[in-house]
């Protein structure tokens, strides 16, 4: 029966693999605790790969720390405001100095205008009588008033020519009628008086008014020129015995069969009529310009008062009167 107990498939030598000396040696070796296990303690760990340094600057990159903006202090605000005020003050001082310089230049220009040599009337250099006035429309008269001022100057010239023609007409009248010697004498007197008086009494005031925008000069012109228009009306009528060869005097010569003398006197009467019409027209033009300037009679009074009180002649006269009154007492 023992023969049946034998395993035919069994190894004749019963070998236990776990009884192998190499295995038992490993299993009997002391095992360290799990806590003492260090996977990085092996000497055969991964080798370290050297890092290749990039070419370039040897200085490391430095990040600038960001600085948050701080609120300005009150002292800084005050200092900035003071600096702005100082700059504005310097700018104002510079502008004031520039204005003062321009004002001095303007005063020098005006002074140079005043010291210019008189050029009217245009007399030759050898004449012993020198010019009495300075007249330059382009320099002294504003551009808006130059045209009307020249027209008034031409009217004065026409006025002078008409008076001279009136003298010749009265001479012809006197040559045809010996009883008209008074008219001829008065015509000479009118020519000698009215020619310079018209220039001084109404042309020069309007010239000064346009030059300096003086209300008082405007009122002087209006008053004298209105009287001049009245004289023109009397002259164009031609009342005999007044030295005017107007329409009545010219028509009266037709009875004496002096046609040539009558024609000459009618031409002069036409000149007087033309002067009267132009005077009325120019008076209206000047008055309209005067109204646009906004001047008034009160302003003219103030200018007249300032001119009187600032006059050296008035001061001397007042001082002389005061001294005389004091000595009399």
Swiss-Prot record:
Modified residues annotated as Phosphoserine in this record: 319-320
Region described as Interaction with SLC9A7: spans on this chain: 203-218
Listed transmembrane segments: 154-174, 182-202, 219-239, 263-283
Gene Ontology biological-process entries: post-Golgi vesicle-mediated transport; protein transport
Region of interest: Disordered: 1-21, 51-72
Keyword Ubl conjugation: no
Any one annotated GO CC term: Golgi apparatus
Swiss-Prot/TrEMBL keywords: Endosome, Golgi apparatus, Membrane, Phosphoprotein, Protein transport, Transmembrane, Transmembrane helix, Transport
Pfam families linked to this entry: SCAMP
Subcellular location(s) of the protein: Golgi apparatus, trans-Golgi network membrane; Recycling endosome membrane
InterPro entries named among the record's database cross-references: SCAMP
Chief place where the protein resides: Golgi
Family to which this protein belongs: Belongs to the SCAMP family.
Description of how the protein assembles with itself and partners: Interacts with SLC6A4 and SLC9A7. Interacts with SLC9A5; this interaction regulates SLC9A5 cell-surface targeting and SLC9A5 activity.
The protein, known as: Secretory carrier-associated membrane protein 2
Species this chain originates from: Homo sapiens
